[in-house]
Amino acid sequence: MFARAAAIASVPVMREGTALDAIDSRIIHCKGALARLKELERVVRLLTDSMAGNSAERTIIPLMSYVLALCQGPLFGVSPTLRKRYELLSQMRLVKLTEVNAAASLGAVDLWSRWPADEDDASAVRSKFYDETLHGRILEHLLHTTRNCHALYQRRHKLLLAERDACRTAETQEWNDLYSLAVDDFLVPSEITLGLELAVLITDRDTDTTDMAYQKLNIQVLGMLLEYFNGVAMPTINQYYLELQRAVRNKGINQNNILTSLPFWAHTLHRIFAMLLRAKYLLDIIQSVLRLAYLPNKTHFSHPTVQLASPNLYLFRNVLEKLDEICCGTTVLSARVTEYISPFLQQGVTHRLTYDKVVHLYKEAVRPTVSSLTEAIDLMSNLLKSWEASCSAEHISRLQTLSEDDVSTLSAVEDKFLIDKSLYEEGQKRKQENKKSPAANSTSKKQAVTLQRRPSNRIVSTNASPLRQQVIANGEKRISTAPPMRRRSLSLQRVSPSPDPDANRRSNSLQFSSTNQILLQSSVREALSRYQSRHANIERPLSTPPGTFPYHAFASSMVDEESRRIASLSLAEGNGPAAIKVMANMASEYEDTSRESSLSGCCNYQTYANQVLAQPQLAGSFPTVPLVKKVRFTGVPPPTEDEDPKPKRKGWYKKPAVLHYPTPSQSMIQKNKQRHEGYVFRTSLREQQREKHKQPGRRFAAFLDHVKDTNTLSGHKAGKIKSKLTR
């Protein structure tokens, strides 16, 4: 008993997660079957009422073969007799109307699907397809079989609910509250409702029952079913599949947080089982529909004229080979998913909700099932495209000039096959390359565009000025611009101020720098304007070649003159010394640069000016900035040295006390954790007290004295309080 409890405790079970046992699985299957049978009974009644108003001029015939195909799956598996009757009805054969009174049991239901040998004679199938009397009797027998099966499932459902309540009394109420919300999106029998649209209106039997009309009717049915699968059935399955995929791939996150992010995470196993059961129903329905469409028209699809009309003959022949395996062979599309969900229905099987269990079900059951379902829908889509092309008006007009035994027709078919094969292989190869390196392809495209655009920035025009040519020859220094949302000041090297910079200034230090920066911007702007005006007034001699124009002396004189003007600027009263010092340093720097190289000095001067002028906030606020001293708040002086002391050493800080002691080793920490002790209590209180009192013989003397003193004090206080109350 203790070993079993320890084993259960070692399994990382999700908090408040619901385990999935055989009773839950059978309840899910039983509830889905009851909903389908109820909807089927309603559809059969409506189809019977629609046939009641038939006349010689207007006849409505339900397509019972396709209606019965929508009932394929483990729906009638509750009784072998009812299962056999359903198979006979699918062959358009009548059955007995005696009621089956099988004893209700809690055993597993047969989930395997079996298809009888359908007729492949097109004329015989077409004659039954338009038989009004036969379809009316099939509806009557199907209604009786449906009611009988519904009664058996109701008795089975009651027994399962009673068994569940007896086994899990504590979780019954929670299960009843969340059960319908957790799995109902996979149990809605919406495909049964399509039976109301599966009917044909006959107004003229000579034109409405021809071979071409029969093929067009099958094409319409396939198109409607394909639209339903892609638009209604698959989105629900794909959505939950993607949610499971994200949960499985997020390995670095906490496993509990991953599972709790799923919808109805406490019933994750129930939802997975319901989704797999829903996928099995869809796979069985698709296989039944493909058998009805392929077997009677197998000869038609192999006709050379039909193959010439296909968009891709190589793909069409591959589709025909797969259809031959599915419809004429022993291949069952739902065989794999049936093997996965059958163990869930076995008695005594319980699956606990763990992260590893969800990952295992996703990899072994969910992913292969969704892949098989997608491939089956694609197979139906490819068949529909080729079939529509063979029945188009353009192809019908071509049939008058083509013959089946004509040598030119057969050679054209082979030529089309070779061409379509090469095109198909090239397309598949291109898709594989795109899947392998999508990032590399996108990067190469971006790099190609960049390489095409880069040389345009370095193009040297013959009409450019000599100064520009010299700058390009020496190598222009590029200035990287910041994004427009975050403008940077190149002089202050910090983020641009807020829309109201005056309110955010803390002390007088930033006021000086901001004022100096504003004056520097204005002076540089004026200097550049004068420089540009002088440069525009100077006329270059016609006899001087472009490469020998004396710009060096002109640039040197301009830099010297403007530097002296900037150095002579002064601020308002009270701020003058700081501003004059900054401006003088700038002037001396520009003078030294101009004396070394006049041309490079001019370029550096323009570059620095552009950097300074790249601050629209300061430049725009220059006329409105008052030159007054700011404080933090009204009536509060600037911070003193006691409040904000300056560091005495550069890069020096006081070492925290915790850094003086070495950290304990990991093994010691783990050892103390296992003993449920902290690192501080590595010495017991007994040893401390014994060393303190130096009495090895008395172990608990000091400890008992301490307890005695504590009790005495507490008793003394209690006596005082009692005496006050008794006064």
From Swiss-Prot:
Provide the gene name from the record: GIP4
The species this protein belongs to is Eremothecium gossypii (strain ATCC 10895 / CBS 109.51 / FGSC 9923 / NRRL Y-1056) (Yeast)
The UniProt entry's GO CC annotations, sorted and at most eight, read:
cytoplasm
Q: How does it assemble?
A: Interacts with GLC7.
Q: Does the keyword Coiled coil apply?
A: no
| Biased amino acid composition, Polar residues | 439-472
Q: Which GO terms describe its molecular function?
A: protein phosphatase 1 binding; protein phosphatase regulator activity
Chain positions covered by the region annotation Disordered: 427-514
The UniProt similarity line reads: Belongs to the GIP4 family.
Q: Which domain of life is it from?
A: Eukaryota
Ranges of biased composition (kind: Basic and acidic residues): 427-436
- Give the protein name, as stated in the record: GLC7-interacting protein 4
